[in-house]
Amino acid sequence: MSNKKSSTSFLVQGSILAMASIISRIIGLVYRIPLTAIIGNKGNDYYGCAFEIYNILLIISSYSLPLAVSKLVSADMSLGRKKNVYRILKCALIFGLVSGTIAALILFFWAEFITGTIMKTPYSIFAVKVLVPTLIVVAVLGVMRGFFQGLGTMMPSAVSQILEQIANAIVSVWAAYVLYSYGTKVGAVLGNTENYAAAYGAAGGTLGTGTGAVVGLLFASFVLLAYLSVFKRQMKRERRAKVDSYSYIFKILFITIIPVLMSTTIYNCNAILDQAIFKNIANLQGYSANDISEWNGIYTGKYKTLINVPISIASALAASSVPALTAAYTNGKKEAVRSQINTAIRFIMVVAFPCAVGMGVLASPILQLLFRDSSELAASMLQLGAVSIVFFSLSTLSNGLLQGINRMREPVKNALIALVLHIGLLVVLMYAFQLNIYAVVYANAFFGLLMCVLNAHSVKKYSGYRQEIRRTFVIPGISALIMGVAVYLSYQLALYLFRVNAIATVFSIFIGVIVYAVVLLLLKGLTEEEILKFPKGAALVRLARKMHLLR
């Protein structure tokens, strides 16, 4: 396969997963609107706290499984070892079931200590307990998704992801409504209506997560069983196949998982550390429990929810780049490796810059449109933290790139350095400058920036890739700034004419997309060859030619 075909294929597969991630995030964003209306900022605090605890145990138990499985499957498929691929699948399913069960037991028995003593959010225990069985389901589902990604097809993962989120959305809102009402009655009896209503409502929200995971697992299982009937016939035609022992596969699986596990744990535990440090220091500084809960509820329920939508594109592209890079790296195709790294970084920067600028410019209108929140605090957080979209998009992608070229320890080392410095900055901002929740926003963005710099150095060192600056960063950045001006002016004009925030916001976003695309092409930020690598690239090229934007 040529470099061009290789990078095109992996970008198309990555785009499929990215589109599924975007759709899933949009569904997630949409259902968070009625969910927030039901449980409020305090309920969002309990909900967010429960998820941070759940996420850490998910990361430790099975988050790295899809990546590890896709790496091993991709490497063996590139060598034609299908019987070994089947063994990898069986071993990974056993591994996922065991690790998920252990994590579920830990969460069940330690939930009270973690929520009350460490996180200072005792009422989140109801939501945490609901999430316990989900750890087992997600572990097995992750293995299946990793298997398909290793085969080079993202469609089963993409469809299961969307189905999972649809079920999640429906059940979350319904269960939150029902349990919030029940919590109100319980709270009335116990003399604490507000906290118990929010706590039970948050538990209802987490019930949707487990239900969605079960739906995703059922779909993935159906596709896997259908595929294996064909795959087993292909295995029979494989002659003189060298098959690794089960003990060896478990060993390799474990060796592959550990570095990924360490890097993802360190990379993602900054969120739970942020909450713990913020709440403990804010408590020592004399802020009321209600204020702390409100601030953190806005941060986790609104700010993080919005910021994570564009970052999910980078996560999807990172997931798709690992098996493609592993296959190229295993076969010694250095030029193909560098080509795919270049394609992935350029694609993600073209998306991240306008998302960051747009989110910053339209912070207040978006919050009013989605959450009916016109508070200065929420808007300021989004304006100040929008730049982290660029940082986390690039750092998330570069983690995947390093793992794809078998430099598993580099993200671990880089994440550890960034985490230590990030915690230091957070403590200084909280104590010396008393920035309360803004300190978390600044420190979080700083963590993403450090990961970008450190990972970029590692990618260059181990792949020989030299980063091009002008077309990758400067032109998308300038195009996004021009777009930002157009978005601001068009919003003000539409608001003046129609006096309706929803119309003005949607109109300004539409104008922003057009302006960004036009300026990007006029500044030669994308070539015709690069556009052709995108899904529906030929149609985009024809449109650009008709508008005389390509020569």
Tell where the protein language model's regions lie, with residue ranges.
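Signature of the first transmembrane helix
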Residues: S9-L67, A104, L135, I258-I277
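N-terminal membrane topogenesis motif
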Residues: M1-I27, K83, R87, R240-Y267, ...
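Interfacial/gating helices of multi-pass transporter permease domains
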Residues: T36-I56, Y123, N195-A203, I249-T256, ...
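Membrane-interface junctions at transmembrane-helix termini in multi-pass inner-membrane proteins
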Residues: V138-Q161, V387-I417
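Helix-loop junctions and terminal segments of transmembrane helices
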Residues: Y63-S78, I311-G332, I345
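Membrane-proximal transmembrane or re-entrant/amphipathic helices at the cytosolic face
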Residues: L489-R551
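Membrane-interface helix-loop junctions in multi-pass transport and translocation proteins
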Residues: M155, I166-V223, R409, L419-V453, ...
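Interfacial segments at transmembrane-helix termini and the short loops linking adjacent helices
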Residues: E112-L131, M359-I389
